[in-house]
């Protein structure tokens, strides 16, 4: 019975992540999101979003011709946003792969 406890804990975390991603988080999933893996994942997604918003804001400022905004700064910020987004996609892919492996484990 003790070997199932870690697996059940991981499944509960994945369910909490799925509910959070769907926007239907329950009160039980809220404590899990504040710390641990789920919390770190949420903070990472927030950082990716902030990087993209900063890059697109700088891009818009350049397009409007605001002084002090150079093209090379815009390109660097856009590449940073792209790299962070691609990293997030790879983390998601690994998470889905791990979930599928756990679901295919014999009990």
Curated annotation (Swiss-Prot):
Annotated TM spans: none
Pfam families given in the database record: FliE
The protein's GO terms of the molecular function aspect are: cytoskeletal motor activity; structural molecule activity
* Localization annotation: Bacterial flagellum basal body
Record-level GO BP terms: bacterial-type flagellum-dependent cell motility
Q: Which GO terms describe its cellular component?
A: bacterial-type flagellum basal body
Superkingdom classification of source: Bacteria
Keywords of this protein's UniProt record, alphabetized?
A: Bacterial flagellum
Q: Which family does it belong to?
A: Belongs to the FliE family.
NCBIfam families in alphabetical order: fliE
Q: What is this protein called?
A: Flagellar hook-basal body complex protein FliE
Species annotation: Cupriavidus pinatubonensis (strain JMP 134 / LMG 1197) (Cupriavidus necator (strain JMP 134))
